[in-house]
Amino acid sequence: GAEQRHWRYRRRVPLSMNTMPAALIGLPALCCLHETNLDKAGPSSGAAAGPTGMLCPVTHVEEGAMSHYDPLIDSAAARLGRVLEHLGQRVSTAESCTGGGIAEAITRVAGSSQWFETGFVTYANSSKARWLGVEPATLEAHGAVSEPVVLAMAAGAKAAAEADMAVAVSGIAGPDGGSAEKPVGTVWFGWALSDGRVVSECKRFQGGRREVRAQTVLHALERLVSEAEKTAANRSSV
């Protein structure tokens, strides 16, 4: 964590505001984010139109500690593991902007080899095409951060890993790379589910690069949990 990195630096160079690199100043007290549910937000509520005309809700940020997200992510990953073990199902991931963060969170859970199949980190467009079967024409027409691409990524990850469900993310974590149409913080999600559905969602997160990535990991896991729990409930009612 941030405290450990701070300690390692202090072992080598005495810390002071004059000697500490700017990137390390305040590192143990990074931003904490508070997510506001604006899934049904309209144009007047601060939502931005996504590349396909869908609304990307803006997630607002409050100051605090980045460590706020760690227990939430760990809790979501643990819940996912419990329900997938109950179902006898396995999940795979396809990540771009999070760089393997979802898979890393999953594998922090002891025993996750029982329900986690494969993690794909397809950062480059060529990797999305090669490993997940995303058509180059789709990437060319819509860009990597788009609904058609994450839907294809999710379906490709599920098929390639022979998993029961999969999640895919592609976004602009910043600090650069945004545009008027796709500002920094825009993230597209895709979930390929065990019942054959492939669903998508767009979010607009605020904060720095780490904050955007943390929120992305958390939301990806929470939706997986929600969908897996629905499957478990449906089985119980039969």
Residue ranges, per PLM feature:
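A general signal for intrinsically disordered, low-complexity N-terminal leader regions
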Residues: 9, 44-45, 63
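Serine residues within intrinsically disordered or low-complexity segments
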Residues: 16, 44-45, 236-237
